[in-house]
């Protein structure tokens, strides 16, 4: 399994609808860069945010998750409080082919401000808008920007197709259209 180059990503994005909308170049003048890079794709952050807030003194329980754990915000940016957490989604819709596995990494600009981006792998056969998890590890508030680069996706092509894809397995996060909270099925 190898990380795939720009021309391969572009071909699969256009031919298979792997990324939509697809920006076939790196856009970075005056913004956090996004679009196609040499061995990845920098996705953009949408403008709807869910910020962890302890307004109701709830315990975060992944088996019994409460919407009360979050405050919803919408706008051109979001300020993540110190040592806090925020959920958002990508502008781009991903449709992962059956022979591809995708891993997400953070952007160095945000990392240097104390932001860690975490996304579990996009499995073969998965499709939807990606829910992004941002942790502010700094002791200061950090601003993140909507419609600008938020993370980079790396694409790995398997030597052969998997026996059972995410969609065939009935994956619980299949077809996400908005920020999706934890689901226990």
From Swiss-Prot:
Keyword Nucleotide-binding on entry: yes
Per its record, the protein catalyses: dCTP + H2O + H(+) = dUTP + NH4(+)
Q: The organism sits in which domain of life? A: Bacteria
- Keywords in alphabetical order, please: Hydrolase, Nucleotide metabolism, Nucleotide-binding
Q: Name one GO molecular function term.
A: nucleotide binding
Which Pfam families does the protein's record reference?
Answer: DCD
Pathway note: Pyrimidine metabolism; dUMP biosynthesis; dUMP from dCTP (dUTP route): step 1/2
A single Gene Ontology biological process assigned to it is: dUMP biosynthetic process
What are the binding positions for dCTP in this chain? 107-112, 131-133, 152, 166, 176
Q: Which family does it belong to?
A: Belongs to the dCTP deaminase family.
**UniProt protein name:** dCTP deaminase
Q: Source species, please?
A: Anaplasma phagocytophilum (strain HZ)
High-level lineage: Bacteria, Pseudomonadati, Pseudomonadota, Alphaproteobacteria, Rickettsiales
């Amino acid at each position: 399994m190898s990380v795939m180059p720009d021309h391969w990503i572009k071909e699969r994005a256009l031919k298979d609808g792997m990324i939509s909308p697809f920006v076939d170049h790196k856009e970075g003048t005056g913004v956090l860069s996004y679009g196609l890079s040499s061995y990845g794709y920098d996705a953009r952050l949408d403008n709807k945010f869910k910020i962890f807030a302890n307004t109701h003194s709830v315990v975060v329980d992944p088996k019994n998750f409460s919407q009360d754990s979050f405050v919803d915000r919408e706008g051109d940016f979001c300020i993540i409080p110190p040592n806090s957490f925020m959920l958002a989604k990508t502008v781009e819709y991903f449709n992962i082919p059956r022979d591809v596995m995708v891993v997400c990494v953070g952007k160095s600009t945000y990392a240097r401000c104390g932001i860690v981006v975490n996304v579990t792998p996009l499995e073969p056969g998965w499709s939807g808008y990606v829910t992004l998890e941002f942790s502010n590890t700094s002791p200061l508030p950090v601003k993140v920007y909507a419609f600008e680069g938020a993370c980079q996706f790396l694409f790995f092509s398997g030597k052969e197709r998997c026996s059972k894809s995410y969609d065939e397995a009935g994956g619980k996060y299949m077809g996400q259209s908005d920020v999706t909270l934890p689901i226990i099925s």
